[in-house]
Amino acid sequence: LSASFPAEEKFGLVSQIRRSVVSIVSNIAEGSGRGSVKDFVRFLNMALGSAFEVETQLLLAMRLGYSSANDTTIVDKTNQLQKMIHNLIKKLE
């Protein structure tokens, strides 16, 4: 996806999207290893926030013309991930 972005976005939007995606999985992993449900839920909430960041950044990239309408599948998958994380949080609370 990010390969189609302009070169000047390499350290801007591309970098931010990549950091946000890494943040999602890293927070889930760290939270699951914390040993308490309360901590896990806290890290899941951070992962959820990062998932919303990714969605916003992807939509921005589409509006700026860096990505095509065909990339809506990625946004849809991000929305599915948000729902899964949200449902897990609700189940654990």
Regions found by a protein language model. Give the residues of each.
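Amphipathic alpha-helical assembly/interaction segments
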Residues: 1-93
